[in-house]
Amino acid sequence: MRRPLDAERIRRFMRELGEEAERDVRLYFTGGATAVLVGWRPGTVDVDIKLEPETDRLFRALPRIKDKLEMNVELASPDQFIPELSGWRDRSVFIGREGRLSFYHYDLYAQA
């Protein structure tokens, strides 16, 4: 069992994955990662993400980064479980940018 992820390890994941992006990509965090980065709780068991657009290079980098940082990463977002809400991209909150990878909290309204 891997240890819970705190904000620093999630930010390290952001830096590591950002180094791999060869073009502009958006990554949306959902669930536990959002709760940790916003400060609602100290840790999470995994990081749920959505990439737009999906790129082979980032998908290939994920297993290596997951192992290096000893973390679980799931490709999951609310639009896989409920109908996509109109305007969700506009409501997604910008976190920061690492290289060519921009990080957002997936629309909190859709996560509720």
Residue locations for each model-derived region?
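Compositionally biased terminal segments of proteins
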Residues: 1-112
